[in-house]
Amino acid sequence: MNGVLYITFTVILSVEVIIGNFGNGIIALVNIMDLAKRRKISSVDQILTALAISRIVLLWLVLVSWWLSMFYPGQWMTEGIDVIVHNVWTTLNQISLWLATSFSVFCFLKVANFSNTIFFYLKIRVKKVMTGTLIMFLLLLGLNIIVINASKTILIPEYKVNMSNSLNLKNTQISMLFPFANTLFGFIPFAVSLVTFLLLFFSLWKHQRKMHHGAQGCRDSSTKAHIRVLQTLIASILLYFVFFLSLVVKVWISLFLERMLLLLITQAAKIAFPSLHPWVLILGNAKLRKASLSALQWLRCRHKDEHRRVQRPEVHSCGSSCMP
């Protein structure tokens, strides 16, 4: 049973990494090529590019760590390397979460409309808001690193892979506060994203109430902008919720009997956010959507060409054998 779970999780993890790297790669490549062509890049494209690159590195870290733990279980995951991997994962994960949150805040400030002095002040100073978000992220990241490296440690169960490719339970000495810290510090950007979504929804509701005022064209364009951003944020919030829920479950995982199965499920759920979220961003952006369709069409044509090259020798050999 352990071997089946291990193989299933390996397949799921590999598929998630492939899907995530393809989506994040499209976002990064399109924006970098656009920067090289125009010699400038917008604020939202800067956020998306940094988000895509951080997620590519994060996904590769997870995949490489998993495969190394499979082939070199004893030599790879020593106590020192375990601490380094946790710190690097925490840093990349926090970067990914806060960049996704910054994107939500940016969209909210650009689309929403409130007759509030504070909101108007923030709306015309979007770059300063993004800078303030970055400073807050750096402070929280430093505090997070300090907490997970606290000197007080306990022995908790963690799954390791032995040479026979089966999963065994092994006691590993890590920070007692590590799972709680990840949940706590992961909740902060999630809460910010949720608040921006609710405020944007409230802005759309207020706009709908005032639809009988103003011109028809302006009314339609504002409504469409609200709905388009809300669609992106709804999908983002759902994926964010799955990610945060996986952190909460991991905290309480020791209370359940089938801990191995729950551990694999939560691990797969955590990777789903950086893997699937880029496709939500692509679908909500016309430029990225067009580039992704072009990339998929190119891959389809390449597949057809390879298929034809394989079939041609077979047809030729059959024709030659039939000749007298």
UniProtKB/Swiss-Prot annotation:
The record's Gene Ontology biological-process terms are: detection of chemical stimulus involved in sensory perception of bitter taste
GO CC, sorted alphabetically, is: membrane
Q: Where in the cell is it found?
A: Membrane
Please give the residues the UniProt entry marks as glycosylated: 162
Q: Which InterPro entries match?
A: GPCR_Rhodpsn_7TM, TAS2R
Question: Membrane-crossing residues?
Answer: 3-23, 56-76, 95-115, 129-149, 184-204, 237-257, 262-282
Per UniProt, which keywords does this protein have?
G-protein coupled receptor, Glycoprotein, Membrane, Receptor, Sensory transduction, Taste, Transducer, Transmembrane, Transmembrane helix
Q: What else is known?
A: Several bitter taste receptors are expressed in a single taste receptor cell.
Q: What is this protein called?
A: Taste receptor type 2 member 116
Q: In which organism is this protein found?
A: Rattus norvegicus
Q: Which gene encodes it?
A: Tas2r116
